[in-house]
Swiss-Prot record:
CC annotations in GO: cytoplasm; ribonucleoprotein complex; ribosome
This protein's encoding gene: rpmJ
Family named by the database record: Belongs to the bacterial ribosomal protein bL36 family.
Taxonomy, superkingdom: Bacteria
HAMAP family tied to this protein: Ribosomal_bL36
Protein name: Large ribosomal subunit protein bL36
Keywords in alphabetical order: Ribonucleoprotein, Ribosomal protein
One GO BP annotation of this record: translation
Pfam families (alphabetical): Ribosomal_L36
One GO MF term: structural constituent of ribosome
Length: 39
């Protein structure tokens, strides 16, 4: 999982979700695309 100040979709399969007030990207096609915003 990458932790970044700002998260962006890397492909069409990426989905933006919010968990515990944090924005996250999950991807069914490529698990390398998983990201989380913030500290």
């Amino acid at each position: 999982m990458k932790v970044r100040p700002s998260v962006k979709k890397m492909c069409d399969a990426c989905r933006v979700i919010k968990r515990n007030g944090r924005t996250m990207i999950i991807c069914s096609a490529n698990p390398k695309h998983k990201q989380r915003a913030g500290k």
